Amino acid sequence: MVTKLLASRGATIQELNTIRKALSLLKGGGLAQSAYPAQVLSLILSDVIGDPLDIIASGPTVASSHSIQECFQILTTYNLLSDMPESVHTVLSGSPVEQATQKDFSHVHNVVIGSNRLALEEAKRQAEDMGYFSVLLSDTVCGEVSTIARLYCLLIQLTCLSATAGNDLLKDKVEGELSSLVAKLALPGLHLRDILRASQVEKPICLLAGGETTVQLRGNGKGGRNQELALRVALELHRARATADGRFLEKYEIVFLSGGTDGQDGPTEAAGACCSQELVGEAEREGFNVEEFLNNNDSYTFFVRFQSGHHLLMTGLTGTNVMDLHIVLIRAKGRD
């Protein structure tokens, strides 16, 4: 109940795990302490941005770096303090959890064997083998899906504009908005120079990024963050293309994909979805109102009904989770 309430308000995975650690005997280093003095080897699959060992799986073999006061602050931020069960208040009202010293965990060896970065690096190799000029943008993408959709729309526009003669004023405008948004999102390691360099090659382009977005629930539809992100990117591209300045996009084939590496996006059977810049126009001609589906957080229903689910990413459960992968493919029309 606690994590569902937090997730519905847009809490990050870091915030969710901070609360989980405070409410568990095994999380936050509890498992390692229970095993002491036996040697402990922990093989870790990271599903958290930045791979912080004390946050992944709520850190059962890592000393906790958070206090009870931080838990109260998180619950207050999302206006959930009064909605918590009495049992939660009882636990959190206890004495602050003292941070264990490093020597308490000298018997523990933690090794990250899988992460979003590793998945992206392998995807990059695969794309290059398929003939794409690939750029790994970031493995720390996070934020509300509508903002991230705007980010990807601007990245796509800048990539295409950089490969198109003229349009210098529009390119400067797009690059300026993109730079401001990147700074606002505080995405470390996302360098626009890599995109500009990619635009100068003759190969089709593959932009790769990963992380974990959040969805602000406003409706009662069915969907997941990856499907909603794909649908919002499609809408952003549709709007950009509909303007007089956006006609340059018609010269390119563009595909965006967002998928969860665990094979399940929200309470759906899909891992995510893909879209093109033509998707919204095609949907409108078939009688679908994309904005209505988005306003109801009903992206899965849209993708199931639209073209018989052709745009859904169906992998089945993978048995692992290293967050989400975002892939953009750009190819100039008429170029093999």
Feature-to-residue mapping (PLM):
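Short glycine/threonine-rich loop-to-helix capping motif typified by GTGT followed
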Residues: 145-154, 182-198, 215-229, 266-275
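Alpha/propeptide regions of enzymes that mature by internal proteolysis
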Residues: 1-13, 112-113, 125-137, 216, ...
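Glycine-rich, mobile lid/loop segments that gate access to catalytic sites or pores
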Residues: 1-55, 60-63, 298, 305-309, ...
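Glycine-rich phosphate-binding loop plus the immediately following alpha-helix
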Residues: 1-19, 53-55, 60-88, 258-270
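Internal helix-turn-beta structural module
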Residues: 234-336
